Amino acid sequence: PGLNIRAYNHLLGESGITFFAREPDDKLYRKNFPESLNGAPMLMPTSNCALRRSLELWFERIDVRPTVVAEFEDRALMKAFGEAATGIFTSPTAVEDDVLDKYAVTVIGRSEEVKERFYAISAERKIKHPAISVITEAARHDLFSA
């Protein structure tokens, strides 16, 4: 017996990508970014993730081949490995300040060519619930209106 559930995607916004590294490697990779990523140890999302495909296409376009040292399904785990100086990792630029506050890493570069999109998923075609409406509008305004 299948479930008959309808779900609707509501775009909250999109963000470029920020690249992070741990000191002292950050200085090495910040200089000549993004060319400095060539051969650099990279922590990547798994291959079934849209961000992974976007990063690989961008690397190919700019002719850069980082060395993938680990793949992650879990973003928090990837950041923890990055903080432990295992490699460079990415996070949406929209939450860059949060990453800098929580992890002992620094920004080595950014790309607006690689985008991540964020959605609210609801059972309603048009969001009517007042609390959900406030949350989605706050995300659109506070996170994605730069």
Where are these regions (language model features)?
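Flexible hinge/capping segments at coil-to-helix
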Residues: R6-S47
